[in-house]
Curated annotation (Swiss-Prot):
Polar residues composition bias: residue spans: 53-67
Keyword terms of this UniProt record: Autophagy, Endosome, Membrane, Protein transport, Transport, Vacuole
Sequence ranges of Basic and acidic residues compositional bias: 1-14
Chief location category: membrane
Extent of Pro residues compositional bias: 23-35
Region of interest called Disordered, as start-end residue ranges on this chain: 1-105, 433-455
Name of the protein described by the UniProt record: Vacuolar fusion protein MON1
Pfam families according to UniProt: Fuz_longin_1, Fuz_longin_2, Fuz_longin_3
Name of the gene encoding the protein in the UniProt record: MON1
Compositionally biased intervals (Low complexity): 443-453
Family: Belongs to the MON1/SAND family.
InterPro entries for this protein: FUZ/MON1/HPS1_longin_1, FUZ/MON1/HPS1_longin_2, FUZ/MON1/HPS1_longin_3, Mon1
Function: In complex with CCZ1, is required for multiple vacuole delivery pathways including the cytoplasm to vacuole transport (Cvt), autophagy, pexophagy and endocytosis. The MON1-CCZ1 complex acts at the fusion of vesicles with the vacuole, through its regulation of the SNARE complex during the coordinated priming and docking stages of fusion, and particularly at the stage of tethering/docking.
Amino acid sequence: MARETEVESSHDGPPKVTETSPSPSPSPPPPPLPPRQMISSDSPAQVAPAQAKPTTAVSSIDISTVSFPDGSRGTFSTSAPRVGFTPHTNASGYGTPGRDATGGDLADSMSVMSFAPTLRPHGDLASLVADGLNKKSRAWNMLRSQSETVQPFESIELGAPGSLAGFEREFDEIPDDKTDDIRMAIWKSKMKHYMILSSAGKPIYSRHGDLGLVNSYMGVVQTIISFYEGANNPLLGFTAGNARFVIAIEGPLYFVAISRLNESDAQLRSQLEALYMQILSTLTLPTLKSIFVHRPSTDLRKPLEGTESLLSSLADSFTRGSPSTLLGALECLKLRKSQRHAINNVFLKNRSEKLLYGLVVAGGKLVSVIRPRKHSLHPSDLQLIFNMLFESGGIKSGGGESWIPLCLPAFNNRGYLYMYVSFFDGNADPAFSAESTAEDTPESSTDTNTTNTTEKEDEIALILISPDKESFYDLKEMRDKLAAQLTKTGHLSLIRSAARERRPQIQTIAPGAQIAHFLYKSRANVQFCMSALEPANPNPTPGTSSTTPTTVATTATVASTSTSTLEPEKMLTRRRLMTLYHELHASMHAKHAHLKVLHAVSEDAASLAWITPVFEFYCVAGPNAPRAAMAQGANRVIQWAKREEERLFIIGGGVF
């Protein structure tokens, strides 16, 4: 069949030719093409550039964040319409890439951007592209200069809700005149408990509450431990609510620590080991074993009678926060190398033949030590001695000198050594009467309260240890010679003045550093040093500025002004600080962690940990302190510690 051809005429274009087939249902014609724009030869072509558009619309509202000097933050929305993308500044003060107001593109090189949103960005964004990311706004620079002065925990008030709410009442005794329900409620409110019981279930010691009050709970603990022991799967610890239970089994004794202070199992277990060492220092290991071999149900409270104060003072030091226990190291009194060497020489020249160890201690800090060439005292043994001398107060109240049989478990847990202790206080000792008279000037005696509060720091003790129980008079004679020689050379007054200086300030060590407190441990010497913490004054007195710093460390200024308010605040700040250090230490020393540097930021503080084979360093700063500034301050403190190493630490000591 022949096809038919139609020719149509159009006014807008050339004629169209259409072929038609004899199909019974012809398809509709396609739509006409749009008219083509005529290009004038007088003007160049205006072609819009191809611009990428977002594939997902998140929000059409701009959210701005502002940081206040007290560390708090606020957010608000801006309703101004946006024309394309505009450069803006995020909460950390750094500009983020975008298009300009004219809608132009960024440079071709700006193809990747990394931004990690956090609750508290601190401006540590790593730019992968152009340097425009690191540009700070002028308003942020002005605000940052004020916010960086915020001290750790400054925004937390005493009694504020939180994990440490009520900690200021932690060491209050449970009253005996209340009903059992009230006493039990007070006991349960304590944040830290230590229990010691025998494998037969006999209670031995409890830090809070008498044994009659907690006897039933000890029975429950003994049942749980015995159940797991019977299954040949000793129980190491468990969690109940927000409390962590850690159990240590030492022969016939069970040690239990219950903590709500966010401490790791390893840290709690080291504290329980220290309590066990305290018991061994009284009984020795063979005596302890023989007691329970013959009578497993023996009540150990009678052999340990009189040592409850030592256990309680040691436990309270753990609850308050003990850097020495956390780091497993000693703190020494800062002295010049020549001065310490001269004191060691006086020691060695007047040494008795029956002397094993000789120590001079001031305010709980080691000043000088002489020892045999191949023997040294373990820090845990020295911690027991310092706890006995300076924390419990039993020896100091007994008079000017004491003779004490003592087992040092890390040195030898199977026998006793004999310790001669004498305090140099100037009043009870005629050898120091001239010195005390010279020092009792009107300026030093105007404030008796200050003198009483600093008595612990001024206490200087001479400790002479011998394996011979008949060497009392020999060591007493050595003490008299040392007293006369140290007084004559002026070394005793030198030690006392050094003890009164207390710990160094950050601004003295590294002026301008943005860290508030640090711990530095020399791993080779097993010794540490620390600084004083200076937050803003929480309760400024009339006529003083609210930003005037006040020392939180143990100082006469703090202790003599409003002790009813500052003492709980100081104790709470110390606990918060030590909680941060416990968390850092646990993270750095976690099994299989292998961390070298750790930076952590919370709502109240920023912290940094750094561990090398030479040292361990931990520091705390305000919540707005940048990481780079903290690292710079840490470097300066570490360099200072290396320069002052022979003053801060005892290297070798006197050896005979």
